[in-house]
Amino acid sequence: MSWNFSPMSGPWLATHIWDYYDYTRDKKFLRKVGYPIISSSADFVVDYLWRHPDGYYTAAPSTSPEHGPIDYGATFLHGVAKEVLMEAVTASEILGRDKHKREEWKNVLDSLMPYKIGRYGQLMEWAEDIDDPDDRHRHVNHL
């Protein structure tokens, strides 16, 4: 693959900022540095997702970053969205900020497309069961 379309890379990186806070419990860091990045990443996720006719939030276009095909509803995307939204909700509660945003994040979080198991017993990487049983990639995406 010579290029990659991965709009969730920013929110994925924001989850590492939460990891730093989670380890240090440095509320000053969370307030001044972490929360602005985490909350803006959660806002991006809310803006990027759309409600599929089945009622779940998903994204299109969407890719499995290490496997390439473009479809809707990549599990990697849902995993990152779920994590950054949960972290934004928790950080908002800790800091007592953005109650209106927190409710929006929770609403999207509660309606994210769930993880699915495919016909081969695998965690599906896309909303449709298009995984290739002959794919010898060394691992599934980082979730």
Outline where the language-model segments fall.
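Short, flexible coil/linker segments at or flanking structured domains
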Residues: 26, 47, 69, 133-136
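Short coil/turn segments at secondary-structure junctions
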Residues: 21, 25, 29, 65-68, ...
